[in-house]
């Protein structure tokens, strides 16, 4: 029996044990979760910086990396709502203990809102400023109400996510 078959049997066992309770698969190979997990992490953990320290990029393909987590979320978007609900990991709005730029935080949170079904932050929202609260409300609304979400890849490797919100076409352009 292959490792993949063993993993699939383990997921079937978990599904049987959980019955109708929802399962969020985190760390499970994405294909073995098809139809068995209700939600599944689609990439690596995000980091408090953009792409981890330089030497980790030399040794570890699968590592903590906000950049790589975003790449996985975008490139595995077709699984969302088909195989399971996608969990792109958390986003950050906070300033303390976070080295992401304001633009990087906006990209991370907006991509998570548009392309995932699990929308979580590791921040403590009670500490948010009024501006951060307003941004959280905007993102929450985006996660719940955005329609016709489409992703395009430009020749230069940049992404453009187009979506409709309140009857208007909006877009987010970014490069990883």
Predicted feature locations:
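Active-site groove signature of glycoside hydrolases
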Residues: 1
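Glycan-recognition surfaces
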Residues: 4-5, 9-127
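Polar/charged alpha-helical tracts
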Residues: 12, 16, 102, 130-145, ...
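A generic structural motif
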Residues: 25, 53-54, 147-155
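Short, charged low-complexity intrinsically disordered segments located at boundaries
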Residues: 41-46, 139-149, 165-172
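Carbohydrate-binding surface patches
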Residues: 102, 106-120, 152-176
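Aromatic- and carboxylate-lined catalytic core of secreted/periplasmic carbohydrate-active enzymes
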Residues: 109-153
